[in-house]
Amino acid sequence: MAHRIIRTLGLAAALAVIVAAAGGADLKSVAKELFAVPSTTGNEEMLAAKIRGLLPKGVAVEEAGLGTIAVKLGGAPGPTLILAALDGYGHMVSGITPEGTLTLDRAVPPPHARFDAFLLGQPVIISTAKGPVQGVVSQPAMHLLTPERRKTQVEGFSLDIADVDIGVRSEKDARAKGIELLDPVTYPAVLTELAGNQWAGPSLGVKAVAACLVSAVEALAGKTVGEETVIAWSAQTKSAARGRGVRPAIGSARARSRWQPKRAIVVDVIAAGKGDGFPFPGGGPVLVQFKSGPSDLRQAFETAAAEAGAPLQFLTAPDTPLSLPFEVPPAEVVTLALPVRFLNTPSEIVALKDLQALCEILQHFLQPGGAK
């Protein structure tokens, strides 16, 4: 763990020198900066440090354990909690072979059955105490395989056969590059700008939502918001608390215990519909409620969307691990979600007008009177 502490302190010091605050940076610039920083469950410290560096000068940042950070904005007694995730899904180094190749594992269960199979033949980045190390998940020469073997190679892929080549010949050489067990392994942060004002990239949705909260703090810092508001970036959101049945995310359970909010807004991602399916990409953020029907929070967000002139979609769906801890009367909770096409793949696609609408609605909601 010592190398993680060194990595965190070094990055935080560099950020303090290079970037003291966002200084009016637009949403797209902030999103691009956060997108470049790897952040998987248990390794959120680099993204947390980056967010600290982008927040306005004079804003006090609280720590809530496990890597969660938060900003408290003044106002009438509340609090209202705005919560987003710091961590995305990824892998970690589980072993170093005598030949210098790396084996992989996950800190948390995958979001879907095909998640690990995307690794086959792909470049990866190992974040070490000495800096990023490039590698590639090896695969046999596909042109030499029969169609049956190719199908088996893809459909039968598992982490048990994943092998990462980092261009060395021994375990000693791998460690000389800084490789240690538990180092996070992620896809390269390659952002592709698509037609129709869309972006594509790995873990793009989580980073875009985190950027939206940075933008909200920048817009509201020093102003009196409708209620005392805590804006938090939570670590450990993909790791479930102990128990039976549907279990809450550790990070959100700790956030509820720490701040005891009267109302919570979970800012999350949601899989956009396929083809013309709902929720529609480009149709605005999605307000998700556990129970159908009117509520004070729904009315407040409908008003905020109207004031912002932004589209808003509605969905009734079961609680997610992020929202579950807050579903305790008399507290209220809703999820404001960014539609993401191909969610939890190396090529998540986000419509920038959806991201902009989400931020504008959230900021109007937080203005005086918006959270009543």
Which residue ranges define each predicted feature?
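N-terminal hydrophobic/helix-forming segments and targeting peptides
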Residues: I5-K372
